[in-house]
Amino acid sequence: MKLSFTKMQGCANDYIYLDCRASGVPADIAALAQRLSARHFSVGADGIICICAPVTPGADGRMRIFNADGSEAQMCGNGVRCVAEWLYTHGVEKPVLTIDTNSGAKRITRQGAQLWQVEMSAYSTLPADLPAIHMGEGPLVDQPLTVEGKVWKVTCISVGNPHCVTVVEDVDSLKLEAIGPAFEHHANFPERINTEFVQVVDAAHLKMRVWERGSGETWACGTGTCATVAALTELGICPAGQDIHVQLRGGELVIRVLPGRQLLMTGSAVTVYEGVAEV
């Protein structure tokens, strides 16, 4: 069977996009995500994103995300910008789009060619919202976490999906392939966790790497970048109400923390190519 797809990327966080608005999500989507995401052997991607019919009145579409290991994710900040770009270039030419996700409807505003701003949900630092266990019931800000025999200071943030943020001196020297899985599968996070390692350049500029649950190290993570800026705002390192520039392996995202812990994320959404895969 032949499967038409669009390859898109936001800060090199690349996914295979399927138009499922009429057909629905393929029944074998988990296996399909594993097979097509395999780099060097297939299309290669961080996963598959299905563009579906909306479920909320007035919404323009729905996004469902399947990681490279076949698991379904709640939200992807880079992915939702690409869904907006895909809809915009496929007949939904509106400056503001609303897209349903597994963590609620997101409002996305076009800022220019291949540039979109996402109004993210309010973040939380409470363990019940991650979830996290064995870490108390209060805000998880600047808390000790023992991973592979080393004590790390972490701040845990939910932005619709769970993140663990830790500040390091030199992000480039980290061996994420060794430490990332230990964070992801830590016993304190029963549903696994995404982990961000961040180096502070100054109060408005950060450098970050991310280990995503279900995908491993990726070149960017929109929700992870939001969680990182939220965490550093909680720590008093970054100011609220100002644009914070975060450099990832795949490019730059700009995040702003608004009153009420709301977040704005601005970044690119680029179509790489369209293709057909034999499945």
Predicted regions and their residues:
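Intrinsically disordered, low-complexity regions enriched in acidic/Ser/Thr/Pro/Gln residues
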Residues: 116-120
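Active-site glycine-rich loop that binds ribose-phosphate moieties when present
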Residues: 124-153
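Flexible, glycine/proline-enriched loop segments at strand-loop-helix junctions
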Residues: 73, 121, 128-132, 167
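A glycine-rich beta-to-alpha transition motif near the start of alpha/beta enzyme domains, typified by
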Residues: 1-113, 165-279
